[in-house]
Amino acid sequence: MDRSDTNRGTPLFTFPLLLQTAKHHIPILIGIAVAARLAMFRLDEVIFSWRSTDMASIALNYYRNGFHFLYPQVFWGGNGPGYVEMECPIIPFLLALLYRLFGVQDWLALVIPVTSGVGLVVTVYLFSRHLFDPAVGFVAGLFTATSPPLVALSTALWPDPPMVFFGALGLYLIVQWVETNKWGYFVFGASAITIAILLKLTALYLGIPLLYLCYVKYGSGLWKSASVWLLAFLILILPCLWYIHAHTLYREYHNTFGILSGGFLKFATAEVLLDPGFYGKSLGRMIFYHFTPLVFVVFILGIMVSQRDRLHYTFHVWAVTVLLYFLVAARGVSLGHFQYMLPVVPPGAALAGYGTLLLLRKLESVPSLARWPKGTWALALALLYLGGTVVAAHVYQSPEMYTTKMWAHDKRTGLAVGRLTAPGSLIVVVDNQMGGPPDGIMTPPNVFYFSDRRGWYLAMSWLTEDLIEQKRREGARYLVITANTVATFEESCPQIQGYLTARYVPLLDSEEGLLYDLAPGKEGATKSDRPN
């Protein structure tokens, strides 16, 4: 039986008519989602951040070096091929195929994130409509369509919107299987969740709501069901094979995104979990950015109301699981990497949609408020929500944000290096973004991508004269001090700067950064030798 339009415990609500008329819900939500992305969209920032430039670099390497799917390559792999341990490179591979069809153009990097973001809006609507009713679905879809972090991440090349989309789609299809026992839902639901885990290993958190749905279907005897074990096998077999392969790439080539070993690991440490500031900052980001204040209030209202049966608690279990996942990925969350908190949007929006109708019903029952024109109610709530959303988007995506300014400076440095260095040459990029040991950091890829050069990354704290000479012997032709680091470098490393200036020709000394030609002796790089 199709229960998408039946009442599943949602409070009665008599206005406005748009919420009750499902016919045009999906086109309206798609229109709102597209409009929100157009409002936030900036072509020069589609490929801009660390993760975006890494993904675009891998896509370029597929496009240029052959479509060898199992061997993703980064630009910062030194003088080697740059094969890297990472999540399954589905997105950069598809982007490379788009490059093959249409040429290398930045706007192509929008296709997958935008499609995933809009797809998530539709999925949340259908899911919420199915478990509650069309009115809840529409409000949940509206909250998803205008969610500040989802809008921001789906207008740039990030893997998180596709991961969250496929995870939500998979759970929705598995709910359909639980109710109907149709194997098409089973297979496609398992496939969607497999893709989510391939895109990001952290999507393993979906296992808890999946286990809950199996419990709804089979009760305490779920362990005896062959379907449950088959579901687990179908979901996990490809991710296991991929991540085993990815780890072999790390062991051989020593490049990693920090997903399994080496690099910066985002997982919790005792220090982070015992820090009260972690919880305060994370809660603040969730209230003011991922939800916005009004949505957070109705989310709390929605999650506190009891439901009529076990299946209705799917969103509750999903939301609580995401909160537990924040603790698992606490180190990444603590640094303000808001993409780690994106999975809260779908279950949060669904419960907030339910809570919104509860709130409106309660307000409608107050005699002094019931006399207000219904259009006034709708306008007041819409303005309150819109205000919180616009403020959140402005604050967190402002050009004055530290990371935005840092990435902008890296882009300027990279473009300058691309102009001044020989194509195909190897570079050494030095900055102060990373200060830990080499095997415990992320590698900033921006300068490599925007210069279209390969090479090595060195944190300024590691820099020595011997290390510079070692990289030169390994093939480095140029050394770059990024625009973000010039002032600190000149203040903290005058001896190394003097060494470089005495031995090598400076090709750049400006607000775009410092650039030295590491050809042997100053006579090795006269002005006539410099690239135009």
PLM feature spans:
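Short helix- or helix-capping micro-motifs
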Residues: 31-34, 140-145, 193, 197
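Transmembrane alpha-helical segments
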Residues: 38-39, 204, 355, 360, ...
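Extracytosolic helix-loop segments that constitute the early lumenal/periplasmic catalytic or substrate-binding loops
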Residues: 38-42, 52-83, 90
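Transmembrane-lumen/periplasm boundary regions of multi-pass, lipid-linked membrane glycan transferases
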Residues: 54-65, 206-311, 322-334, 387-389, ...
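Transmembrane-helix motifs of polytopic, lipid-linked glycan transferases
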Residues: 108-131, 169, 173
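Membrane-interface transmembrane helices that cradle and orient dolichyl/undecaprenyl
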Residues: 129-135, 170-186, 196, 306
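Short acidic/glycine- and proline-prone juxtamembrane loop motifs at membrane-interface regions
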Residues: 149-163
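Short periplasmic/luminal acceptor-recognition loop of GT-C membrane glycosyltransferases, typified by
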Residues: 407, 417-464, 472, 477-487
